[in-house]
A protein has these predicted regions:
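N-terminal nucleotide/polyanion-binding subdomain common to many enzyme families
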Residues: 1-83
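Short, flexible loop segments at boundaries between secondary-structure elements
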Residues: 171-176, 219-256
């Protein structure tokens, strides 16, 4: 995979021009670029998604340095994408019919849960409001992470976006999903039929899973693979203060906070990124 030939979103303004419908939005940074050099499936998932967001100052600078096809003007973090899409859906929900809880489907109580799957995954806050004439409230779904993190996300969403209905699904915690796991995840997503879907299983797993099962997802909404944002929004991991973000040093902040986990990714990884850019482009 060559950075020089990738189609990358160049500014935050472009996020507002993403069309309605089933759209896959991935992010790319130095680490994911490095991984893609050795993982052909991951590289294919990134290249064949609909939109690719430059989630790293290193990507922005490297595109300028090698005179790449895309010239992003700024870093667009996964967090920026998340806030943009949540605000977009919230504004849309404000203009739609507000559905009373009495119109919930039979057998599913308000604030109810999707059933526990055989593989351990389960959906929670699975209320799907159905309005008269088949209309329903706007639904945002979070697929991934632990039930603890998802509970915190539901609580924060209730405060930040009270006009949105939240559905969550915590998949089994394992390196690879079984066919049964995949079937249950797909069924949960299709049952929720969300107006916005977030996939959070860390790269490259989340991108490869979403791309591999794209055709099986019978949905018509924006889908973002945003891994760490689940933890940021839940508050289980804190983002760098604005000064660090504005000076393109968020990576250094994370390294200082979690040196044992991040040293290989950022110290060795940044060197590999420079080498890959010079060799591969």
């Amino acid at each position: 995979m060559q950075l020089k030939t990738l189609d990358i979103v160049c500014s935050r303004e472009e996020l507002g021009r993403i069309p309605e419908g089933k759209v896959l939005i991935n992010t790319i940074n130095a680490h994911s670029y490095n991984v893609a050099q050795k993982d052909a499936d991951f590289a294919e998932a990134l290249q064949k998604g609909d939109y690719l967001i430059p989630d790293g100052a290193s990507i922005v600078k490297a595109c300028r340095w090698i005179k790449a096809k895309s010239q992003p003007k700024e870093r667009i973090a996964g967090w920026d994408l998340f806030i943009h899409e949540m605000e977009r859906l919230s504004l849309k929900a404000d203009a739609e019919f507000q559905v009373p809880s009495s119109n919930l489907p039979d057998g599913l109580p308000e604030g109810g849960s999707l059933p526990m799957g055989e593989g351990g995954g389960r959906g929670s806050q699975g209320s799907l409001p159905i309005g008269e004439g088949g209309e329903r409230g706007s639904v945002v779904m979070f697929m991934g992470s632990s039930e603890h993190v998802l509970q915190l996300i539901r609580e924060r969403c209730a405060k930040d976006y009270p006009n949105l209905r939240v559905v969550t699904y915590s998949p089994p915690y394992k390196p690879e999903f079984s066919e049964n796991d995949n079937r249950q995840i797909i069924e949960a997503i299709n049952q929720a039929d969300p107006d916005l879907l977030w996939i959070g299983m860390t790269a490259p797993k989340q991108e490869k899973w979403t791309y591999r099962h794209w055709d099986a997802l019978r949905i018509h909404c924006h889908v973002g693979t945003i891994g760490a944002v689940f933890d940021f929004y839940a508050g289980t991991v804190k983002r760098a203060p604005l000064w660090w973000q504005n000076h393109s040093l968020e990576w250094l902040y994370r390294l200082l906070k979690e040196p044992r986990r991040m040293w290989r990714r950022y110290i060795i990884g940044n060197v590999k990124f420079l080498r890959n850019i010079m060799v591969v482009g």
